[in-house]
């Protein structure tokens, strides 16, 4: 799964963008691009890479951003997640299971790529969204659903026993990512990250502060964020390098996603006053 990690951890944003296109081509994954011209707000423009199923069958959308903050390798944020989704896309294609994939530009500059997609998304064909961000370091899958955990398309990924099997936990806060673009558009979404187990308690503490509501934080909130081990893997932290990416963490997420897709839908039990 780490096969393409080295190819994707490029600091130059234009080369990074082209590297993703090259990897998708090498893997035989046909894609289309969704773009927005350069502007004062987005000087490099926006380029999303989209993988669509062969039919218009309603399906899940799996997404991750491929851009990185200036000067960062962007290994955990977010090349690891890209590698996971590329492998998942290939597997589902071979199994003839319909699914949509989007590799978004501009997450680090205000979610410009996912906003572009969400505004133009056909809600009749996207049943739900699972967004991956920070999936290459840690041992515990953290899932933030903002109340979408019981939505039909997303419920298979949120069951108690299923989460226990994959060492996952539902949390009430994760840092805002591309999932927010879909929440604002009324499309149910989950956001997923992998963190060290001891970081879960910090996420719970951050949730008690109401997250960074409206983009505003307090000194206490920022202090908690900087105490988290996962923070060291992003934005120039001392673990913001490819050698810290853990293949076990990536496989954990991949196995969780694949099994969630393959799970048969839950059968709702009913009660009838009249039995034949």
Label every model-predicted segment.
Residues 1-54:
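A non-catalytic alpha/beta surface segment that caps or lines the substrate-entry region
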Residues 10-17, 74-78, 246-250:
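Solvent-exposed, acidic/flexible segments
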Residues 28-38, 186-197:
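Short, well-structured beta-strand/strand-turn elements
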Residues 45, 69-157, 164-175, 179-181:
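Acidic/histidine-rich catalytic neighborhood of metal-dependent amide-processing enzymes
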Residues 58, 62-70:
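Glycine/charged-rich beta-loop-alpha catalytic/anionic-binding loops adjacent to active sites
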Residues 60-62, 102, 128-130, 188-192:
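Hydrophobic/aromatic beta-strand patches that form the interior of the parallel beta-sheet core
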Residues 133-136, 194-199:
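Glycine-rich beta-alpha junction loops
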Residues 201-276:
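His/Asp/Glu-rich mid-to-C-terminal helical/loop segments that flank catalytic regions of hydrolases
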